[in-house]
Amino acid sequence: MAITTAASRLGTEPFSDAPKVELRPKASREEVESVIRAVYRHVLGNDYILASERLVSAESLLRDGNLTVREFVRSVAKSELYKKKFFYNSFQTRLIELNYKHLLGRAPYDESEVVYHLDLYQNKGYDAEIDSYIDSWEYQSNFGDNVVPYYRGFETQVGQKTAGFNRIFRLYRGYANSDRAQVEGTKSRLARELASNKASTIVGPSGTNDSWGFRASADVAPKKNLGNAVGEGDRVYRLEVTGIRSPGYPSVRRSSTVFIVPYERLSDKIQQVHKQGGKIVSVTSA
């Protein structure tokens, strides 16, 4: 699976030329176990799973040849385990983004896809929402009955929209990253750009772009100091913060908040942010 020459910086290098994980006829026990691990890793967004959380019955059916990989994927996606991780505590649009990522290996291409699944869930429920991905022609033509879903959004394919390549990197934040261990939490990553029909700039998942999980705020947060320096010197910094929770602080539903701070007050501001429970995701020159 050739991706790009920047694979190491985008966190996709482990998938370069990696073979598809497939359950073949007369597979050995080790091969079956490898398939089970691959399904859990991909469908659960690389989140940790306890031994007590494993789907013992579905695993047994797969080992005995009474369940295809496709149906095992369906069992995981419909399980209480999946719901606890991604359904009960997430915005509906976030769940749809993750369903596309986990079950079809790509990001939504446009807002109409999200609207369709919102309507489907409202009218027919959770199980119908999951079935719509796994029973789709797209799933069948790419994974069939016995291939574990993988990230298709990293490569160019027939019928793929270019925006999908950029958007998959809003959902995928590195090989070792988990879908439940990101700065933006359970909020939608793509709602704003899908609504405006724009694709965001790709931001690498590691230190290549100032911090691990950071991307510049897409709203009105200032990106530059628009006036004169306000300190004794001319060094002014842009401090981007997320997750501030403190009495009297406005609760604004957005991924980050920006402060323009002179150098001599930078240390004090950082301490204040930490006391308010915030996370500093970027410090750049303003």
UniProtKB/Swiss-Prot annotation:
Occurrences of domain PBS-linker (ranges): 2-180
Keyword annotations for this protein, in alphabetical order, are: Antenna complex, Membrane, Photosynthesis, Phycobilisome, Thylakoid
Question: Per UniProt, what is the membrane topology?
Answer: Peripheral membrane protein
Keyword Thylakoid attributed: yes
GO terms for biological process, alphabetical? photosynthesis
Sorted alphabetically, the Gene Ontology cellular component annotations on this record are: phycobilisome; plasma membrane-derived thylakoid membrane
Where's it mainly located? membrane
UniProt cross-references to InterPro entries, sorted A to Z: CpcD-like_dom, PBS_linker_dom, PBS_linker_sf, Phycobilisome
Its annotated compartments are:
Cellular thylakoid membrane
Residues in domain CpcD-like? Answer: 234-286
Transmembrane ranges? Answer: none
Membrane in keyword set: yes
Judging by the UniProt lineage, the source's domain of life is Bacteria
Q: What does this protein do?
A: Rod linker protein, associated with phycocyanin. Linker polypeptides determine the state of aggregation and the location of the disk-shaped phycobiliprotein units within the phycobilisome and modulate their spectroscopic properties in order to mediate a directed and optimal energy transfer.
Q: Which family does it belong to?
A: Belongs to the phycobilisome linker protein family.
> How does this protein assemble?
Associated with the phycobilisome, a hemidiscoidal structure that is composed of two distinct substructures: a core complex and a number of rods radiating from the core.
Instruction: Name it.
Output: Phycobilisome 32.1 kDa linker polypeptide, phycocyanin-associated, rod
| Native organism taxonomy | Bacteria, Bacillati, Cyanobacteriota, Cyanophyceae, Nostocales
